[in-house]
Structure formats: C-alpha cells, structure tokens
Amino acid sequence: MTEQTIDNILPASKNNVKQWYVVHTASGAEKRIKEDILRKIAKQKMTDFFEDILIPVFGVSEVKRGKNVKVEKKLMPSYILIKMNMTDKSWHLVKNIPGVTGFLGSKIVPKALTESEIQNIFNNLEAEAKVAKNSKLYEVGEIVTVTDGPFETFMGTVEAIDKARNRLKVSVSIFGKATPIELNFNQVKKSD
C-alpha cells in the first residue's frame, strides 16, 4: 500500500500547476500569517511553488472621532487565498505557520477552488467595495436630486438606505404630497 501524501494523490503537483486554495486562520491574524508565509517562502527558496497570497478585503469610509477615515473590511474573515502548486513540501510550509488551522477540503487533501468559485469571490469583493463606497455617499435626512427615471430633476429627502440592494428610499413632493420612492444609488446625486 502506498503512503497517502499530497504528491501521490494530486497529479497537478507534479506538473507545477498553481491553483487557488483557501486557508483557514486564527481570527484577526490574516495579515500576520500572510507575512509569515511570505517570509518562510523566501527563507526556504520556494518562490516557484507560490504565485499569490490574498486577503479578500475592501475599503470602507467610516466616521471615527468626527473624522472620515478609510478602513478595510474583510470579505471572508479568518480566511486567506493562496495560489500555489500543492505539494507535500508547500502544504507543510503553509500548514506549519502558527495561526493556520488548515486548508479547506479534507485533512489529507486540500480542495482547490474552481475557476468559477474564484471568479465568484472576486466578483463579490468588487460588489462589496462598490456597495461600501456608494452607501457612505448618502445619509438618512440628506437632500438629493433624482437624476434618472420618471422623477428626474425632483428633489427629495433620503428616508432609508438598503446597502444590500444598492437602493435608497427617497421622499419626493408630488402635487404637494410627500411620496416615498425607491431608487438605485446611481439614480440620485447630492443636492448642492
């Protein structure tokens, strides 16, 4: 019976094929673990086995202490993505970093992400960044001007913000009566 090693199980490891893998980490330790992996790769001269290490984050503007500051939010807290050639040696390099709890997949064989899965992660990251950027543009009670649709040029007051759907509930005056309408973020602009 042959030994159950990654080199024996995964044919890709012999062809130097790099694929994306998900690594589970200790909470809040993603940056330190990424730096530790990069240091260990350089120290062990294994740069040929690794192509990229990503922490899926997006920038968000928040008000802290009365100032608008940019902070990073994690799309997948406690996870990092590594594009690597999975061999016994590269697996052990990552697995033995303090704070790494394991790869996604079985304990013996990590599961590589498919192209559609990795594309989905990148699309979600892009969408979250867009939502975060746009949702901070408007505040409840703010006066906005409708720029698109049947109520174009109407002015209204933001009543609610739905970040998940990229929509605002805006109260506009129609025939002297306040009427709530739902609009996309890109259908309004801040009034001067």
Swiss-Prot record:
Keywords: Transcription, Transcription antitermination, Transcription regulation, Transcription termination. One of its GO terms (cellular component) is cytosol. InterPro entries: KOW, NGN, NGN-like_dom, NGN_dom_sf, NusG-like, Rib_uL2_dom2, Transcrpt_antiterm_NusG, Transcrpt_antiterm_NusG_bac_CS. Pfam families: KOW, NusG. One of its GO terms (biological process) is DNA-templated transcription termination. The keyword Transport does not apply. Belongs to the NusG family. HAMAP family: NusG. Participates in transcription elongation, termination and antitermination. This is Transcription termination/antitermination protein NusG. It comes from Rickettsia prowazekii (strain Madrid E).
